[in-house]
Structure formats: structure tokens, C-alpha cells
Amino acid sequence: NLVIVLSGVIILYAFLSIYYLPPEDAVARVHDYLEGIFSVYKVRAELSGFFLDYDYTVQQIFNGVPLNLTGLSDFNVGANLYLFFDPFDAYVINQFLFRTIGFIGLLLLLKDHVLPKGSYYVLIAVSTALDFAVINHFPTRFGTILYQPLLYWSILNIYSGSRKLRDIMIIVAYPFM
């Protein structure tokens, strides 16, 4: 079973590596990111003094709109990647992060709560989770869709009686993703 899961992870990373490595020849999805939220991430990354200041006004965004109207949390992991990395690097790290979590989340959900036990069903779970992880979507709010199977897995674990700190931490961390 471990070989099947590791094969799925290797295929996922090979798929992501084709798109984003090497960086000078990257073929990241073709979109006009200037019309979306990515320009807000870039402007926010160049600001200082905005942390937990809900009235912080940015002149470069919609002619002086307060930063809190953009819907960006100061604790959002994905948005804060743009503070520490260049925009392309932050985008690539975010893609690897939320697609990996999406793969693991759906794999755990299918393996533990949906499919019966057995190596054949692990193969079905890995291939379905791999399909889910590489699904094409526009990641404006980072992993909101791809994190849901992991959240649902944690809720089902608590509901079934195997309450662990890990499950509670996943539920608490979900709004910050």
C-alpha cells in the first residue's frame, strides 16, 4: 500500500515539476493575473505597517480602498507567502502546498471513510486523489476547494469518536488556509 501511495506522490510532483521547473522556462497557467487578486498580493507585499491595521488604506488598490476590503487575512498562509517570496516563487510554493494537501486529504477521506479496506481500493483512492489534486482551477483563494476533503476527513474522524488533537488542529487551521 505504501508503494502505491508513494507512486501517487511521485506522479503528482512530476506533474507539478513539468509546469514550474526550471523557473526560467516555466509554463504556469496562462491567465491575465493582473485583473485579479494577484496584483493585490504584489502591492500588499510591498507595504509596511498593515499588519492588524484594519483601516490601512492603499492608494494603489481601487483608488484608496482599505486593505481589509480585499478579503485578505493577515494570518492567511497563502497570502503571506507573497511577503517572503517573489510573486512567481510564492505562486509555485502555494501550488505545491495546496495540491499536496488536496491529494493527502482526499486520499485519507477515501481510504478511511468511503472505500472498503484492501490494496485494490487503495489504488482507486490514490488514482482518484491524484486526479483531484491536478484538477485545473484558478487559485484566487488558495486551497479553499482542495483543503475541503482534509477538513471533511477531520470532521468525520471526530464524529466517529476518534477525536485526536490532529483533527481539531486541522479544523482550527482551515480558515487560515
Language-model segments: which ranges?
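N-terminal membrane topogenic signal
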Residues: 1-6, 116-119, 163-165
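Charged/polar, solvent-exposed surface patches and flexible loops
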Residues: 8, 79, 157
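Membrane-interface coil-to-helix junctions
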Residues: 11-106, 131, 142-144
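Membrane-embedded helix bundles of polyisoprenyl
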Residues: 103-109, 119-159, 164-177
